[in-house]
Amino acid sequence: MNILCYGDSNTWGYIPNINGYSKDAIIRHYDEKDCWWYSLKNHNKLIVNGLCGRCIAHENRWLKNRNASATINSEISQYTNLDLIILQLGTNDCKSEYEDSPDVITKNLDMLLKIIQKHTCAKIMIISPSKIIENNKITQKYYKGAQSKTIQLDSCYKRLAEQRNFLFISGLNLDIGEDGEHLTKLGHKQLGLQVLSKVKELSPAELI
């Protein structure tokens, strides 16, 4: 099976860092074997496209090419014969600077997926954002109100998946690190097991 994993820093494998937003921060990622998508590598051709700061529908003021809705046409056209696309997006859209409600974030995701479906007939799986924990200087500054948003997004994403016949994985209760937004190794393992189980359920007919 040809699988594209497309997402943000939790797809990239960002190691939680309480000083991650400071200008001298050293940003590191987990070894690939500790990332949630590694469990899919057996018997599958895997493409991983994760970028720190990637949003569904917003530009990032520090990093270029992080608006998925603006870049997806050129990105998705690079990949052929995809059977499954797994999207892990929405966390960055919860930042207080964007002022997006859960409904707006979900509508933006739906529009992004419609763009993707113009290029491919691949099955779609969406992973809802993990619950932002507003208990530290990072989340209190950049993610004010995001804990409630991520809780609501879980049901919004699930409803979208049901309406559009997408696969759905809840990321809500995965283990989160000290920065309140990034997965720990345990969180990656928890997610990897869920995704692998869902992928194993797919029959060839469902991939057409």
Locations of the language-model features?
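Short, flexible active-site-adjacent loop segments at beta-strand->alpha-helix junctions, enriched
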Residues: S9, C52, T91, S130-I133
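Short hydrophobic segments within beta-strands
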Residues: Y6-G7, I127
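Histidine-centered active-site loop/cap adjacent to the catalytic His
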Residues: D179-I208
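A short helix->loop->beta-strand "cap" motif at the edges of active sites that frequently abuts
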Residues: Q117-I124
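Residue-level recognition of beta-strand->loop/alpha-helix junctions
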Residues: V48-G50, S128, S170-L172
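Conserved beta-strand segments of alpha/beta enzyme cores
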Residues: K45-I47, K123, N165-L167
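Substrate-gating cap/lid alpha-helix
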Residues: I133-G171
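Conserved SGNH/GDSL esterase-like catalytic core that processes O-acyl groups on lipids
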Residues: N2-L4, G13-M111, I115, S148-I151, ...
